């Protein structure tokens, strides 16, 4: 595979009060928050619109399972289906099955510390 990760897709973290945290970041750091957190838009080297998501989540979310970590990183990738096969061949733990939505494909792995990592093959144009 030529490329694996092409950029940071998002940072997700647990907090006791996501709305309070979003309001604090909006007031003091100027983040333009919505129900999901904050989306940062940027352009890749080819000039395509891309996004990175910042999302505080409820402390009791099960989305990070099987990891017990209070955060989860999301990486933008190319050719997720092939990448998941290659990672499995390399002995990496793949969590669950790949899921496809109108805004991209998602897959999950665990790093050596047991942190769940989300891999996203985005369709940014669907988010514009």
Task: Annotate each language-model stretch with its function.
Residues 1-10, 36, 84-128:
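Vicinal oxygen chelate
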Residues 10, 62, 69-72, 103:
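Generic anion/oxyanion-binding catalytic loop in active/binding sites
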Residues 29-32, 74-76, 96-99:
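Short linear motifs in intrinsically disordered
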């Amino acid at each position: 595979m030529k490329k694996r990760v092409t950029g940071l897709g998002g940072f997700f973290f647990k907090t006791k009060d996501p709305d309070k945290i979003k309001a604090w970041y909006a007031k003091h750091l100027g983040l333009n928050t919505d129900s999901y957190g904050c989306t940062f838009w940027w352009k890749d080297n080819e000039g395509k619109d891309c996004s990175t998501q910042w999302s505080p989540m409820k402390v009791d979310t099960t989305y990070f399972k099987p990891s017990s970590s209070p955060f989860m990183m999301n990486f933008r990738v190319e050719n997720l289906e092939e990448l998941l096969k290659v990672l499995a061949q390399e002995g990496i733990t793949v969590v669950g099955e790949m899921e496809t939505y109108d805004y991209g494909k998602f897959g999950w792995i665990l790093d050596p510390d047991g942190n769940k990592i989300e891999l996203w093959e985005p369709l940014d144009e669907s988010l514009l």
